Amino acid sequence: ANRHYFEQKVKDEVEYAAKSDSVLNVLMFDIDNFKGFNDTYGHISGDKLLALFSNIILQCIRKSDIPVRYGGEEFVVLIRDLDIIIAKSVGDRIRRQLEKQRIYLKQYDERQKVTVSCGVAQFPVHSKNIKEVIEKADQALYYAKSIGKNIVVIYDEIDMPREALERSRQEA
């Protein structure tokens, strides 16, 4: 769905969260090394990868969750009414599903591993301003990429070493 649809959905979900004294999780995904993949294997393969990732997201979320292609190789999923640790585990399930796929590239007769990084923030916990929550999810995503990619990071976990994040992931 496009940006206008996304902005309307964000507005609706924020109103719902405020009225129902609930939370809204923002999961921001970015396919790791997408530009390199696109440059190496071509735009048709890049488009297939984006479509595959969209389908993986849809398989891993609830009907009430809202997935949006945010731009380029970035996707956002809005998840209402869930504890942030559970929302993180949804992000991790999506991450693992993509990692398990080996993208078949017919012209090269090879399968390519592709990974994704994810940042998570929550309204109204991280901010009562949804634009700031989205920015914080983006900051967590940026941190995930900076520590080696292929990991999900909650905004509160920024600055935690990767080893500690991986330990907490295994315990979940």
Q: Where on the chain are the PLM-derived regions?
A:
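Active-site core of bacterial EAL-family cyclic-dinucleotide phosphodiesterase domains
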Residues: 27, 168-172
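Extracytoplasmic/periplasmic beta-strand context in beta-sandwich domains
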Residues: 4, 116, 150-151
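Catalytic/regulatory signature loops of cyclic-dinucleotide turnover enzymes
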Residues: 136-161, 171
